[in-house]
A protein has these predicted regions:
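Short linker/helix segments within small regulatory modules
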Residues: 72-83
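Short, intrinsically disordered terminal segments enriched in charged and Pro/Gly residues
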Residues: 1-53, 99-107
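Residue-level recognition of well-ordered beta-strand positions that form the cores
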Residues: 85-87, 100
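Short Cys/His-rich "knuckle" micro-motifs
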Residues: 69-72, 98-100
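Short cysteine-rich clusters marking metal-coordination/redox-active sites
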Residues: 59-62, 88-91
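Intrinsic low-complexity, intrinsically disordered or marginally ordered coil/linker segments
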Residues: 42-44, 60, 65, 73, ...
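Cys/His-rich microdomains that often coordinate metals
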Residues: 65-66, 95
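Residues immediately within or flanking Cys/His clusters that coordinate Zn2+
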Residues: 55-56, 81, 85
Length: 107
């Protein structure tokens, strides 16, 4: 008699664990990208470009388009950051993107 194959439920659970691990890895990588965390904000010249830049950013999970849900101001110590909360229109993965306004150059 031959070796039994893997049960369908066990194979499905293994695949689900693998997919969750891949999602965690992509989220960890996204946190290291510019704008992925408050420690790595994207520098912009004016608040007017914050939502445009956020909407132009691709989803880290599926590459889809992000839809801006909220554009807020957060204080982190003595620094003021802009944070855009967005959701992917394709896979519905949430994402926060951090921005810092560039200091104006002296005239």
């Amino acid at each position: 008699m031959g070796k039994k194959g893997r049960r369908p439920r066990a194979a499905r659970r293994e695949r689900e664990r693998e997919l969750r691990r891949e999602v965690r890895e992509r989220e960890d990588l996204a946190a290291r990208l510019p704008g992925g965390s408050p420690q790595r904000p994207i520098e912009v010249a004016t608040p007017a470009v914050v939502e445009v830049r956020a909407a132009a950013t691709a989803c880290v999970q599926c590459g889809g388009e992000l839809g801006v849900v909220e554009h807020a101001v957060e204080r982190r110590g003595d620094e003021t950051l802009r944070v855009v909360r967005a959701i992917c229109r394709r896979c519905h993965a949430p994402r926060s993107i951090y921005f810092r306004l560039a200091r104006p150059l002296p005239s």
